Regions:
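Hydrophobic alpha-helical segments within soluble ligand-binding/sensing domains
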Residues: 193-220, 236, 240, 274-282, ...
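Extreme N-terminal segment that seeds HTH/winged-HTH DNA-binding domains in transcriptional regulators
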Residues: 1-40, 76-87
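Flexible loop/turn connectors
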Residues: 13, 17, 282-381
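Flexible loop/hinge segments that line or gate small-molecule binding clefts
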Residues: 159-204, 300, 324-335
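N-terminal helix-turn-helix
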Residues: 27-61
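Periplasmic-binding protein-like
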Residues: 100, 153-160, 219-222, 288-298, ...
Length: 381
């Protein structure tokens, strides 16, 4: 008789405890280390057991928090859903619902169009809307979520702060099946619907734009922030493009500690932080004359880099590409960039939330198409 692997035995035992209510929804499981000690097995074995539970949709793994029991459900699937396929399923409640919107921050380069689209779709759906900004602070995000729920909102759309750990309030909403949709930054391992861009594919395509034109020493520029899913995906896409060319992405040429564009620093330190970052970037550029191009993960970072290059007289020598761009009515682009479809992201997030408020508890991941918009010379004049 074939012997059942140890990790499957552990998985079966924990699964039975969950089904028999030994572990209830919201309970935290022992850590992988604790399980390995409890069952006298290796960490690898206990990790495989927990991964099986997660694959079954019995638990969710929250970085920095632990593994928690959730109501059994199918794991989310990545879908690309056109707007006209988001049809009504059930009527909304008799009284007009109000939804909450929690944003890290927003500006002309990214966020304003999305926010306007959310507001317009709320009107179409018969919703009221309440807006809260966290300004990059997790404590403000938590306070905002709690305040919105106390005020009785029917659901929440949230763009999480730059942090690899999720707030307890978000985990609580997932466990309680409170209607919530994340935008721009997905929460991996948490059963919450998401609407946003395929950042890895977009980053890969933008990096290939430079590689196709002969640039090989690209400086990757990102903010000083924990590796959120969005940043991780953009890094992965950048590296993948280099791998496809048989090249190595030299991380010694990367700038990874810019703070001025982060909402918390921008809000409270402003021009002082910007001056410090510009000084740091200029010093880095002078130290690495071999750099032939710059890839910024945000438009505001690209602007800072371009300003530094211009001060050194290198703006014509080293092209700068980025994600997002300013909202220019005549479609002029200062940099070649990934143009995200903010309007579609905004409207689809409201439609998904409306479905959840009506009772649809299927977790969806909706990837909205993007395109590469090339720089227009007139914008540089």
């Amino acid at each position: 008789m074939k012997q059942i692997p140890l990790y499957e035995q552990i998985y079966e035992e924990i699964r039975e405890k969950i089904e028999e209510r030994g572990y209830r929804v919201g309970d935290r499981l022992p850590s992988e280390k604790e399980l390995s000690e409890q069952y006298h097995v290796s960490r690898i074995t206990s990790k495989k057991a927990v991964e099986l539970l997660a694959e079954e949709g019995l638990v969710t793994r929250i970085p920095g928090k632990g593994t928690f029991v959730i109501e059994h459900q199918e794991m989310p699937k990545a879908l690309e859903i056109p707007a006209d396929s988001m049809t009504e399923k059930k009527p909304l409640p008799d009284h007009p619902p109000v939804i909450g919107v929690v944003l890290d921050g927003f500006g002309a380069d990214f966020g304003c169009q999305m926010l306007g689209s959310i507001e317009m779709e709320c009107r179409n759906q018969g919703f009221g809307m309440m807006l809260v900004c966290s300004y990059g602070r997790k404590d403000e995000e938590t306070t905002g979520i709690e305040r919105l729920r106390e005020l009785g909102v029917s659901g929440i759309i949230i763009m999480c702060v730059h942090d690899e750990n999720y707030s307890e309030s978000i985990l609580e909403m997932a466990v309680q099946h409170f209607p919530v949709v994340t935008i721009d930054r997905r929460l991996k391992g948490v059963p919450i619907s998401f609407v946003g861009t395929d950042n890895e594919a977009a980053s890969r395509e933008l990096a290939r734009y430079l590689l196709d034109r002969g640039y090989r020493k690209t400086c990757f520029v990102k903010p000083h922030a924990a590796e959120t899913s969005t940043l991780q995906e953009r890094i992965q896409g950048f590296k993948k493009a280099y791998n496809e060319y048989g090249l190595f992405a030299d991380e010694s040429l990367w700038i990874t500690d810019i703070r001025a564009t982060l909402p918390a620093y921008h809000q409270y330190r402003g021009e002082q932080q910007l001056a410090e970052d510009e000084e740091k970037i200029i010093e880095f550029i002078q130290k690495h004359p071999e750099i032939d191009s710059y890839f910024a993960v945000e438009y505001s970072l690209a602007q800072i880099v371009y300003t530094c290059l211009r001060k050194l007289g290198l703006q014509e020598k080293c092209p700068v590409v980025c994600f997002d761009g300013s909202d220019n009515i005549v479609q002029e682009s200062m940099f070649t960039h990934v143009k995200q479809n903010e309007k579609e992201i905004g409207s689809l997030s409201v439609r998904l939330l409306a479905d959840e408020i009506r009772g649809d508890d299927e977790v969806k991941t909706v990837l909205v198409p993007y395109h590469i918009r090339e720089m227009t010379k007139t914008a540089m004049d």
